[in-house]
Swiss-Prot record:
Molecular function GO labels: RNA binding
Key word Electron transport present: no
Major localization listed first in the record, in broad terms: cytoplasm
Span of domain KH: 162-214
CDD domains: KH-I_PNO1_rpt1 (cd22391), KH-I_PNO1_rpt2 (cd22392)
Region (Disordered): 48-71
PANTHER family named in the record: RIBONUCLEASE Y (PTHR12826), RNA-BINDING PROTEIN PNO1 (PTHR12826:SF13)
Name of the gene this protein is made from: rbp28
Record function comment: Required for small ribosomal subunit (SSU) synthesis. Has a role in the processing of early nucleolar and late cytoplasmic pre-RNA species.
Keyword RNA-binding: yes
Protein name (record): Pre-rRNA-processing protein pno1
């Protein structure tokens, strides 16, 4: 293997190739467009100091995200707007506006934005509200890093139509929302029933506990049995902690 600093000249004369290797040069300077540094004869690279994230952002165009809002959530959005935008502006230091024409919330980085993940956190917060979560529950996504949203449909568990689908949704909700509240309290999650879609907000382990309970109800398990399994799973999770 040739040394990285060797200069190689190849000339073709007839059928023979004459290769001349010049080893008199001890160091090669690379152009700024390449690696912006030098490499000595021993192969040890010498690079310029890496730019900090602040230096990279300086002069760069601010990033922007647009979160679509379903039509049925536009009125609730207007009602809670004075409560929704302060965490985005004061905590994440983002620029935010409600675009009623495109039915969306637009987020953009500002010069004061320091957290590189602020834009993504803001999107998760607004998306959680758009999915149907209460504003006080969605704001937990800004305060805690280990919270997620898991979404699935009833047909992903079992193919149901008509009255069978309605009964499955009724089993998950329970009379007056009793079953849903019991699952939320036992698993420390928040659940939104949006027609045949189910959204669960919580930690990874807690989401799994709540999802197992919801799946059991969809498959037809009696609520009493689901409650017992839910209590056992919650107790085991508490022991691990």
């Amino acid at each position: 293997m040739l040394a990285p600093t060797a200069a190689v000249n190849v000339t073709n004369e007839g059928e023979n190739d004459n290769v001349m290797i010049d080893t008199t040069r001890g160091e090669i300077e690379f152009s700024d467009s390449a690696v912006n540094g030098t490499m000595d004869i021993e192969g040890a690279p010498k690079f310029a100091p890496a730019k900090t994230s602040a230096e990279k952002k300086r002069g760069a165009k601010p990033q922007m995200r647009r979160v679509p809002i379903p039509p049925h959530r536009m009125t609730p959005l207007r009602n809670v707007w004075p409560k929704l935008y302060p965490p985005l502006v004061e905590h994440l230091l983002l620029q935010v506006r409600m675009n009623t024409k495109s039915r969306s919330v637009e987020l953009r980085e500002s010069k004061a934005t320091k957290d590189p993940g602020a834009l993504q956190k803001g999107m998760d917060f607004v998306q959680a509200f758009a999915l149907g979560f209460d504003i006080d529950d969605a704001i937990a996504l800004l305060r805690l890093d280990d919270l997620y949203i898991d979404t699935f449909e009833i047909k992903d568990v079992k193919t149901l139509q008509g009255d069978h689908l309605s009964r499955a949704i009724g089993r998950i909700a329970g009379q007056g929302g009793k079953t849903k509240f019991a699952i939320e309290n036992a698993s420390r999650t928040r659940i939104v029933l949006a027609d045949s879609k189910i959204h669960i907000l919580g930690g990874f382990t807690n989401i799994r506990i709540a999802k197992d309970a919801v799946v059991s109800l969809i498959l037809g398990s009696p609520p009493g049995k689901v409650y017992a399994n839910l209590r056992n799973a919650a107790a085991r999770a508490k022991e691990r902690i």
